[in-house]
Each structure stands twice: as C-alpha cells, then as structure tokens.
Amino acid sequence: MTSDALTIGRYTFTSRLFVGTGKYKDLDETRRALEASGAEVVTVALRRVNLKERGEGSMMSLLQQGRVTILPNTAGCYTVEDAVRTCRLARELGLSDLVKLEVIGDERTLFPDNEATLEAARILVKEGFTVLPYCMDDPIVCRKLEDIGCAAVMPLAAPIGSGLGIRNPYNLMIIRETAKVPVIVDAGVGTASDAAVAMELGCDGVLMNTAIAGARDPILMAQAMKDAVRAGRMAYLAGRMPKKLYATASSPEQGKIAAL
C-alpha cells in the first residue's frame, strides 16, 4: 500500500482521508483529531477562519505545525463572484493554488448550484488554480467539470452534515467509471462503514468533518475513519468476490466420509 499514492494535479498524498476543521469544541480537540486521522489534507472555510492570524493558539498556527496541506474552501458562498473572490484572497494570503470550490444553491439543503459551480470553476482554472469542486452526484456535471480542467471532482454522498451515508452508490460508480480525474466523496458520511463503502466503490478519497467532530469521541472516530478508508481502498484493489443467489460450499466434495 505504500506505493498507492493519490495524485491530484501536481500534488501527491499517501492518505486518502481529507478532513475539515469545524465543529470541534476547542483547538486542542481539533489538533488531536487531525493527528488521529492521519490526514494530509485539511480543509478550512475561508469565511470562518482568520488567515492573517498565525500566532500561537490560532487555527493557522495549528495547521502549519501539523505540516499538512491546507485546502481552503469557499463554504458559505452563494454566487460565482463570492467564490472566485474568496479563492483569490486565499492565494494572495500565501496559501497554495489548491482550492475546494463550493457555490451553494440552496440554504436549507446546502446543495451546490451546478451552473454557478461550472462558471466559477471555468474562471479559476483559467487563473491557474487547482480546483476541487463540490458537486451533486451527477455523472454529467462531473464530466463537464473534468472537461473544464478541474483536477478532481467531489460529488456528495448525501447532504452536508446529514450523516445519511451513501445514498446513491450507483451514481458514484458511474462517476468513478467515467472520470479520468480523482473522485473524492464529499459530504454525507456518518460513520466508518460509510467511508469504507465509498472506497470499496472505487472512489479515490473521502472528505469529512461532522462525522468526526460530531461523534461522541471525535478522537476515536478519527482513528476509525483512518482505518475505514484504508480498509475500503484495500478491498477495492483486492476485488470482492462475485455475488451469487445461491450458496456455494467452501469445502470440496472430494474426501467426504461415506455412511457406515
């Protein structure tokens, strides 16, 4: 498994678990959860974190000490203009060109606005950003985002923060089958089995926040998610046995003891 690296644009990672930084009770819990997860990519909502504050005790200081790749995101943006402006600000403040693009279309469900996401992605790719767009689990939208030049696609498994798990595994399978860029499941994971299923379907990674931060023991859940993502990836590479309607004996007929 050491050679099974994940490459997104010019970036390469050994961990396929991406995590967020919101909803923890304090910075110490955030730090311990991040360490337990083994994640190398940590996403930060630019609207909720002061990027200029980098002194001791700040979120940015914590992330820099952890030597992780910071993935700024545009959570809370409802227009193309806001999302693009937020990404430009992140780059101006010294963060990398790697961005998680979110353009929300509905306040209640937090579903993405597909048209706005495509438009914003087109602008950002032209400006040299490595764009990872949050999108619906729609194979057509994912294909269009890939055609624009996005370095990965991030279809949701279920609404953000819902914990409902993988609601449409078949769409994710189609996306994975047709996409030539990494597919990172983003949103909806509730527990370790959800993460394992996403990876078993062939997805290249999983991004989560509430599933860890909202657990009764976030540190233990972070460890569980780390193991689940790795186990799911290994199972996908190993190839599961075919499903059958009827039983198949695991012991051969030869050598069966005859009746006395």
UniProtKB/Swiss-Prot annotation:
The active site is at residue 100. PANTHER family: THIAZOLE SYNTHASE. GO terms for molecular function: thiazole synthase activity. It catalyses: [ThiS sulfur-carrier protein]-C-terminal-Gly-aminoethanethioate + 2-iminoacetate + 1-deoxy-D-xylulose 5-phosphate = [ThiS sulfur-carrier protein]-C-terminal Gly-Gly + 2-[(2R,5Z)-2-carboxy-4-methylthiazol-5(2H)-ylidene]ethyl phosphate + 2 H2O + H(+). Its main location: cytoplasm. This is Thiazole synthase. 1-deoxy-D-xylulose 5-phosphate binds at residues 161, 187-188, 209-210. GO terms for biological process: thiamine diphosphate biosynthetic process. Its EC number is 2.8.1.10. Pfam families: ThiG (PF05690). GO terms for cellular component: cytoplasm. It is an enzyme of class 2 (transferase). It is found in: Cytoplasm. The keyword Cytoplasm applies. It comes from the Bacteria. Keywords: Cytoplasm, Schiff base, Thiamine biosynthesis, Transferase. Belongs to the ThiG family. Gene3D superfamilies: Aldolase class I (3.20.20.70). Catalyzes the rearrangement of 1-deoxy-D-xylulose 5-phosphate (DXP) to produce the thiazole phosphate moiety of thiamine. Sulfur is provided by the thiocarboxylate moiety of the carrier protein ThiS. In vitro, sulfur can be provided by H(2)S.
